[in-house]
Amino acid sequence: MTIDTLIDAVIGREGGYSNHPADRGGPTRWGVTEAVARANGYRGDMQALPRDEAVAIYKRLYWQRPGFDRVAAHAPLIAAELFDTGINMGPATATGFLKRALNALNRNEADYDDVDATPVIDDATIAALRSQRRCS
């Protein structure tokens, strides 16, 4: 599963433009909220947000910056879940879920030292993930 496939699925679910009063995100296009679009340099009308700009935001904010692309090299299905969770709950939350799971599965540090609680996919996180992949 490639990042482009994952992004296409998100955009397919999220649809085009929305500004529903019950949605706390406010104006949204392609699943990208106005706040996220503005924080990433988009200045135009949200109804006109180009799809390719939304794709670039998804890749940068929810795949590359949190390091989920690194996870994908070892566990693509886990990376896909991190990507989806990161979009809905924030990349830091998704990373925290992964790290807590890795720590819960390491048999009281028998396989590796606990990974730290920082919201970063670092070398220790990848090593722990690889260790779990060898054990499965």
What are these regions (language model features)?
Residues M1-S136:
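Cell-wall polysaccharide-cleaving catalytic domain and substrate-binding groove, primarily
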